[in-house]
Amino acid sequence: MWFKNLTVYRFNKPFSVDTEALEKSLEDFTFSPCSSQDISKFGFSKALGKLGHTLVHSAENRHLICATKEEKILPSQVVKEALEEKVAQIEAEENRKLAKKEKDALKEEITTTLLPRAFSRRSQIHALILPEIEMILVDSSSATKAEELLALLRKALGSLPVIPMSFKTPIEAQLTEWLKSNSAPAPFEMQDEAELKSDSDEGGIVRFKQQDLTENEVLAHLEVGKQVHKLALHFGQSIAFVLQSDAGIKRLKFSEEFRAHNDEVSTEDPLARLDADFALMGSELIALMNSLVEVLGGLEDSL
């Protein structure tokens, strides 16, 4: 339930979501396991996992969705060795060299033969659709995986007018100024981790972890032109995270004190607790995004 990373997109055209219509749209793209000949399958699954009953979990016009991916694990080395053995056998029997086209056909045949015996692995990715702040937050550190989920959602809905979140002023310029002044704008506080990078290829990258960022050693790198591309921050007393210059938010962690707000919810009803946690997380993520947009100088105008 609790998101661990954020890849953020914003709507660049008006967008409204009707829970019932969204549920119906996703139903046509529900996840189903791989058959014996499938290399991978990707589709929507229950938003709240085994405890849930729907593909979309909504509250206060905030919508949680989940997609499941199953992939067959067929090591390329296994296919390569089987192919080499088969090619050697045929070339010896027929006393000739096989053409590339023939080898490609053999490779496909071998893959088809091996797939039913291959192990598979599953992964899930969640996203939070937030019309009130015109954003979609994807719980992934990988833009590629986030785009894969959005592509599936776009296919289900017919259209999805979103673009990656970007700001009027480069994030690295803002973070560099914060570090120079040893002060992040409220309600954010700098922590003890940063990554500094030079604009030139020769300048290199310097990483600091568990270190006082006000020390001269750190500031010296700023004086020679390096900029801050990653900075660990706290949002009030609720969230710790690392903000990146590409607007990615990594290692998102909600504090124990914040999560304890729902301790009074009965543990005898796990679904009720999940619902309460969803509401709590959604509200705080909205507050986080609104504050980030404000202190970073506003979002870049849509094209």
From Swiss-Prot:
GO terms for molecular function: double-stranded DNA binding. PANTHER family: RECOMBINATION-ASSOCIATED PROTEIN RDGC. The keyword Cytoplasm applies. The keyword Heme does not apply. GO terms for cellular component: bacterial nucleoid; cytoplasm. May be involved in recombination. Belongs to the RdgC family. This is Recombination-associated protein RdgC. It is found in: Cytoplasm, Nucleoid. Pfam families: RdgC. It comes from the Bacteria. GO terms for biological process: DNA recombination; regulation of DNA recombination. Keywords: Cytoplasm, DNA recombination. The gene is rdgC. Its main location: cytoplasm.
